[in-house]
Amino acid sequence: MSGFLEELLGDKLVTGGGEEVDVHSLGARGIALLGLYFGCSLSAPCAQLSASLAAFYGRLRGDAAAGPGAGAGAGAAAEPEPRHRLEIVFVSSDQDQRQWQDFVRDMPWLALPYKEKHRKLKLWNKYRVSNIPSLIFLDATTGKVVCRNGLLVIRDDPEGLEFPWGPKPFREVIAGPLLRNNGQSLESSSLEGSHVGVYFSAHWCPPCRSLTRVLVESYRKIKEAGQEFEIIFVSADRSEESFKQYFSEMPWLAVPYTDEARRSRLNRLYGIQGIPTLIVLDPQGEVITRQGRVEVLNDEDCREFPWHPKPVLELSDSNAVQLNEGPCLVLFVDSEDDGESEAAKQLIQPIAEKIIAKYKAKEEEAPLLFFVAGEDDMTDSLRDYTNLPEAAPLLTILDMSARAKYVMDVEEITPAIVETFVNDFLAEKLKPEPI
């Protein structure tokens, strides 16, 4: 177990009091679950979370005192046998060391050392963290993600009765009545044999309302084509009145607004960090894509439904948002040449498929997304923003969160060059240039 933890966290962590702790010792203590707490001292929501998380942490570990100073920083000799084998590690985005020190001082758990900035960025990218505070629970033995939305765990299970909060099958989580906007109620068993879109949305969110208008047409086209497809609206509205107003525009099903527990469990199951989000499931309840929003906007006629992920995407206005989700390989080409974009996709597809398959076997998300970019206004803006040369073809890896780029500017790009470039990046052999 300690091998995984050391690979993830490095050799040393620190307590709130500044004492170093060997990561290897976590394995010896039999930690079953690791919580990664992504936050920042300047964030008011993070300050609020730290207080409630300290009480939660103390209760689950069975510490004599659940407040600041108990637990990790209190000394191993005096620490009681934990009721639940849980450890939390704070991963900060602070830019000022003094502010970081003041913030972690009262934390009863451990923290990644301030100087480990590169490792912090790797963790943010690895787990696709898009906002703070964020709390992700991992199996400390296998490294597999157990729960992406630990904030809801704290709210929904403050006593830790459902520990270790592992994912449950969709059919189990969705079980219960579903509504149509005419008041008709259907059992969730009516979904059997259908592809399902789980739609997290709210009326107060303008991008949600825009997507809903498009999604209504997509839903109609898919149904008219004879496909077995249903959408379930999981509301994030702030009142039942707002929910009813918004739901009146939707021809599909919804989890009742009053069933807050089921709505929360669905958010936990899919680790929802923002809306709108459309998760598309196969008839067995397995995730086909988490990028339903992008797929619907890119495929107006729904010809590619149910939108199985493509190893290489053609960069567009609707999927450019994915550039912010982690490192992306982008091959810029001269799209004025007939067939250039398709040839470029075929060029990088083998290595993309190889990387995706490798990480899928480990039940992890691939560490890179793969794009081909032609010539249009959006691509020009991307080149300008990242200060890239106008050359084509141009092979790059862009890491927006780290504000870093890696450029392979050669006359001819071959599959071997692409594979070497990707492998060197993953092995951290490439020197980044600032964006």
From Swiss-Prot:
InterPro entries named in the record: NRX_PDI_b, Thioredoxin-like_fold, Thioredoxin-like_sf, Thioredoxin_domain, TryX_NRX_thioredoxin_dom
Highest taxon in the source lineage: Eukaryota
GO cellular component: cytosol; nucleus
Disruption phenotype: Perinatal lethality, possibly due abnormal cardiovascular development. Osteoblasts show an aberrant activation of the Wnt signaling pathway.
Keyword RNA-binding among UniProt keywords: no
EC number: 1.8.1.8
GO molecular function: thioredoxin-disulfide reductase (NADPH) activity
Domain Thioredoxin per the UniProt entry, residue ranges: 167-314
PTM annotation (N-acetylserine): residues: S2
One BP term from GO: negative regulation of Wnt signaling pathway
Subcellular location: Cytoplasm, Cytosol; Nucleus
Pfam families, per the entry: Thioredoxin_6, Thioredoxin_8
Tissue specificity as recorded in UniProt: Widely expressed with higher expression in testis and skin.
Keywords: Acetylation, Cytoplasm, Developmental protein, Differentiation, NAD, Nucleus, Oxidoreductase, Wnt signaling pathway
Catalytic activity: [protein]-dithiol + NAD(+) = [protein]-disulfide + NADH + H(+); [protein]-dithiol + NADP(+) = [protein]-disulfide + NADPH + H(+)
Chief location: cytoplasm
Top EC class for this record: oxidoreductase
Subunit structure: Associates with the phosphatase 2A holoenzyme. Interacts with PPP2CA; the interaction is direct. Interacts with DVL1 (via PDZ domain); the interaction is direct and regulated by oxidative stress.
Similarity field: Belongs to the nucleoredoxin family.
Its biological purpose: Functions as a redox-dependent negative regulator of the Wnt signaling pathway, possibly by preventing ubiquitination of DVL3 by the BCR(KLHL12) complex. May also function as a transcriptional regulator act as a regulator of protein phosphatase 2A (PP2A).
The protein, known as: Nucleoredoxin
Organism whose genome encodes this protein: Mus musculus
Lineage summary: Eukaryota, Metazoa, Chordata, Craniata, Vertebrata
